[in-house]
């Protein structure tokens, strides 16, 4: 099929990847209301077109935590990326590296830290959950430091997993999931050969290394559910702040008071995020939550936003709402599932071109120029 926009990659991935993996990325929790609002709330924000400005010199690059980024985005941590393309985390990291943006490796990646880090030139970011097994957390931090990871992304919005009903229907979980996955493999032969056979082992690399035994996809949900810690508080993170010397970003902030707590805690950044609508359904979209958070802490801490970003225009919208940078999750997973590394590189090129158009026609030469004035206040019309 012809790929002309990032949204085309979703359809391409739907065709190539078996349903249990496609819907794992595509779906949200409960009735998926927040998942839908993440996208629609961004789509409904009108950009303010300005013309007859000299836009011949336009720059999409930023500096974040001492790193130069070619555009204000980071590939977000996504679990089990190695099930979308052969050794998928390596391919996605190489694509990000080639395009000048960071890649964030998930705690529950297929490829372990030690496989991904040597495959790229720039330091990757590493994401960690708060888990009951503090020994695993310390081990993961030590390995991330040894591999040269530059920034720690600490996900705090999963003290308990959300109810993802779509996974029950697709075969990711639910009755007869093993046989359903096998049957889906027969109907997706290219994926079955490229990923299912040549992409082995299909284990959670970071977890398996620590446990000394293979933790596979069938154990994935169970291991996470068993190890999520609903008792966590800011105090539990203090030892991590002392242990981790590099930049630390708290992911999963939706309330201004929590953002202020992150500043008091000493975090270097936050990610305004509802986990892509995969945790608590019915919460605010990130686009709605972002402006009051920016009002509360802008300038005191770096603000990254994710959830619902589907094109380069959405990146500009998030920046105008108060973000310093953005994270892309589903968008890159669709591209990875469709075309591997080349797909992710092409997707990033598309996003950058779309940003160029949006910045040119809103008369913003640099990322720092993008302010709330780049948006139309529809309440006054």
From Swiss-Prot:
Role noted for this protein: Catalyzes the conversion of L-lactate to pyruvate. Is coupled to the respiratory chain.
Q: Where is the active site?
A: 275 (proton acceptor)
The top of its lineage is:
Bacteria, Pseudomonadati, Pseudomonadota, Gammaproteobacteria, Pasteurellales
Q: Which InterPro entries match?
A: Aldolase_TIM, Alpha-hydoxy_acid_DH_FMN, FMN-dep_DH, FMN_HAD, FMN_hydac_DH_AS, LldD
Record NCBIfam families:
L_lactate_LldD, PRK11197.1
- Quote the record's binding site residues for FMN: 106, 127, 155, 251, 306-330
Location (main, coarse): membrane
Q: Which residues form the signal peptide?
A: none
State the annotated membrane topology for this chain: Peripheral membrane protein
Instruction: Name the gene behind this protein.
Output: lldD
The residues listed in the UniProt record as binding substrate, with positions renumbered to this chain, are 24, 129, 164, 278
Name-wise, this protein is: L-lactate dehydrogenase
Pfam families for the chain = FMN_dh
| Cofactor field | FMN
The reaction(s) annotated as catalysed by this protein in its Swiss-Prot or TrEMBL entry are:
(S)-lactate + A = pyruvate + AH2
Quote the subcellular location field of this record: Cell inner membrane
Record's family? Answer: Belongs to the FMN-dependent alpha-hydroxy acid dehydrogenase family.
Gene Ontology molecular function terms on file: FMN binding; L-lactate dehydrogenase activity
Keyword match Cell membrane = yes
An example Gene Ontology CC term for this record: plasma membrane
Q: Which PROSITE patterns match?
A: FMN_HYDROXY_ACID_DH_1, FMN_HYDROXY_ACID_DH_2
């Amino acid at each position: 099929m012809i790929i002309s926009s990032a949204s085309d990659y979703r359809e391409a991935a739907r065709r190539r990847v078996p349903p249990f993996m496609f819907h794992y990325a595509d779906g949200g929790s409960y009735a998926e209301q927040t998942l839908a609002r993440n996208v629609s709330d961004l789509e409904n924000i009108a950009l303010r077109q300005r013309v007859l400005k000299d836009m011949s010199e336009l720059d999409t690059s930023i500096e974040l935590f001492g790193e130069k980024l070619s555009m204000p985005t980071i590939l977000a941590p996504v679990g089990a990326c190695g099930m979308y393309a052969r050794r998928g985390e390596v391919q996605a990291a190489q694509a990000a590296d080639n395009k000048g943006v960071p890649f964030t490796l998930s705690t529950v990646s297929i490829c372990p830290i030690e496989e991904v880090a040597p495959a790229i030139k720039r330091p990757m970011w590493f994401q960690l959950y708060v888990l009951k097994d503090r020994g695993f957390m310390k081990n993961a931090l030590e390995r991330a430091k040894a591999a040269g990871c530059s920034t720690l992304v600490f996900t705090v919005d999963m003290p308990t997993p959300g109810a993802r009903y779509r996974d029950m229907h697709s075969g990711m979980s639910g009755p007869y999931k093993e046989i359903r996955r096998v049957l889906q493999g027969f109907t997706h032969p290219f994926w079955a050969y490229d990923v299912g056979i040549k992409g082995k082992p299909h284990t959670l690399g970071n977890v398996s290394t620590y446990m000394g035994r293979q933790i596979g996809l069938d154990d994935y949900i169970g291991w996470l559910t068993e190890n999520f810690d609903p008792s966590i508080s800011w105090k539990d993170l203090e030892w991590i702040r002392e242990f981790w010397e590099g930049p630390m970003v708290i992911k999963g902030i939706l309330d201004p008071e929590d953002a202020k707590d992150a500043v008091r805690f000493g975090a270097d950044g936050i990610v305004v995020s509802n986990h892509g609508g995969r945790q608590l359904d019915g919460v605010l979209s990130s686009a709605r939550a972002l402006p009051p958070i920016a009002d509360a802490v802008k300038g005191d801490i770096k603000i990254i936003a994710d959830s619902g970003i589907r094109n380069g225009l959405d990146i500009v919208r998030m920046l105008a709402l108060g973000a310093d940078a953005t994270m892309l999750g589903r968008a890159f997973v669709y591209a990875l599932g469709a075309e591997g590394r080349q797909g992710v590189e092409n997707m990033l090129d598309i996003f950058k071109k779309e940003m160029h158009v949006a910045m040119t026609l809103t008369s913003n030469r640099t990322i720092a120029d993008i302010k709330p004035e780049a948006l139309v206040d529809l309440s006054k019309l």
